[in-house]
Amino acid sequence: ENLVKECSKINPNISIKSNNKKLDQSSDIKNFDLIFDCSDNPETKYTINLLSHLNKKTLISGSAVQMEGQLAIWKSGLNTDYPCYECVFPKTKEVAPITNCREAGIMGPITGLIGSMQVNEGIKEIALTTYDSRAGYLFLYDGLAQSLDKIKLIKNRKCPVCSI
């Protein structure tokens, strides 16, 4: 809500909708132009991925823990050649220990950097009619080494979300 207010102060001619409801597979996202995932738990990420794919929405996902962060733009619902989140990070039946921010800690500047990268990609998605989307790549930021790597992602042809 605060972000909506601040953005509206800067530009009163824009329309921003926020969603403060708990997200589940029945959530209605069809009226949103872009979906931003800033969550820190896998189940939410899988749900957002599924909803974005089914509703043909661009999903701009950011994650961070300790001194590392990652950014990905997912467009599997808009282009069948692109992978989705679950192609790259498949669900497993085995319960593996997951490190989250609360347990592992996080450097504040890392979240700021990844968030800024997400916003930058969102602006390009909305404002530029001809631009080379970064969909299909995973960007890995290492705050300790001060490096950014770009990895080309491959679609899983047996993915239960986007290869059905």
Regions found by a protein language model. Give the residues of each.
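Adenine nucleotide-associated cytosolic modules
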Residues: 1-164
